[in-house]
């Protein structure tokens, strides 16, 4: 088994001499990223990547993930490593403090995420997809969606996914056929199937927030007719905690070379009446 040793000298050079870290930390909101803080974070990230994530890389690729009755079990050690990842605050590193993030420069969080990817790419795909969901909600989410979902996504207690590809629509999003039917109360029922969904189903978080591309009934053809919906794996109770299971299930798994420990799911939306989502 190969050992991962983070190239901290190269990372520091890239951050300081190429990306002008000194200038970035002088910007409003970035002043807490002092040289001592940055160095400490890089050192701890290198330690976590080398001692926790790297040893699981080969284990995960040999074991893979297991699917049974729509549920997915991740490889040995992944769930525990993710719990440690969340408890240590790594997921919140570069996120907005308004929603529980640490507000550190994106340059730093990018350097840290590079260590996750280099030491265990299959593991790193989960927080990477969650980060994408966070960014999408920050830009396009409603105030209610931000308040409900962002704190748990930022902390890493919940994970996020991106649902674009369909059996008849790969990179051609104009061909997306998943549909969203309005219920009348501000929600929609989502119907369709999505494939190649990274971490579309797993056991590492209490909930999964799916961002799903679908068409409303009167939507025009092509990409202009596509809308993005928030579809949680579990509907939320009045206290904001996961409750009843939503109508989205993993019906099988794909297998990708080199990342067998990353569950690549085929997700069915609406086979039992419609998956509830919000625009």
Tell me the role of every PLM-derived stretch.
Residues 11, 15-22, 48-56, 144, ...:
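Long, well-ordered alpha-helical segments
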Residues 196-198, 235-251, 256, 263-279:
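A glycine-rich, basic-preceded beta-loop-alpha segment at the flavin cofactor/substrate interface
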Residues 129-130, 141-182:
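Internal maturation/activation junctions in enzymes
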Residues 187, 191-241:
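A short core secondary-structure module
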Residues 1-124, 148:
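Amphipathic, small/basic residue-rich leader segments at the start of a protein or domain
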Residues 168-171, 201-203, 220, 256-262:
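Short Gly/Pro-enriched turn/cap motifs at secondary-structure boundaries
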Residues 84, 92-94, 161-163, 177-182, ...:
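Structured core elements
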Residues 92, 96-97, 119-134, 156-166, ...:
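Core alpha/beta catalytic barrel or barrel-like domain that forms the active/cofactor pocket
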């Amino acid at each position: 088994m190969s050992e991962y040793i983070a190239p901290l000298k190269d990372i520091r050079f890239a951050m300081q001499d190429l990306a002008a870290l000194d200038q970035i930390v002088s910007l409003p909101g970035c002043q807490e990223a002092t040289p001592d803080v940055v160095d400490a974070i890089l050192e701890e990230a290198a330690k976590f990547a080398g001692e926790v994530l790297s040893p699981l890389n080969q284990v995960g690729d040999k074991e893979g993930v297991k699917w049974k009755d729509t549920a997915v079990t991740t490889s040995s050690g992944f769930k525990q490593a993710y719990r440690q990842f969340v408890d240590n605050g790594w997921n919140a590193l570069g996120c907005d403090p308004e929603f529980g993030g640490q507000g550190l420069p994106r340059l730093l969080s990018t350097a840290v995420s590079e260590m996750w990817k280099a030491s265990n790419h299959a593991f790193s795909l989960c927080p990477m997809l969650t980060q994408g969901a966070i960014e999408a909600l920050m830009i396009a989410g409603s105030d209610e969606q931000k308040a409900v979902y962002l704190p748990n996504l930022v902390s890493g207690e919940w994970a996020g996914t991106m649902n674009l590809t369909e059996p008849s629509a790969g990179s051609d999003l104009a061909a997306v056929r998943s549909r969203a039917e309005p219920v009348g109360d501000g929600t929609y029922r989502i119907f369709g199937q999505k494939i190649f969904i990274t971490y579309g189903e797993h056991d590492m978080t209490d909930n999964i927030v799916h961002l799903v591309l679908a068409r409303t009934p009167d939507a025009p053809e092509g990409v202009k007719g596509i809308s993005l919906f928030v579809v949680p794996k579990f509907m939320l109770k009045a206290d904001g905690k996961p409750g009843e299971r939503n109508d989205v299930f993993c019906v099988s798994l794909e297998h990708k070379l080199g990342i067998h420990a990353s569950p690549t799911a085929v997700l069915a939306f609406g086979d039992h009446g419609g998956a509830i989502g919000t625009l």
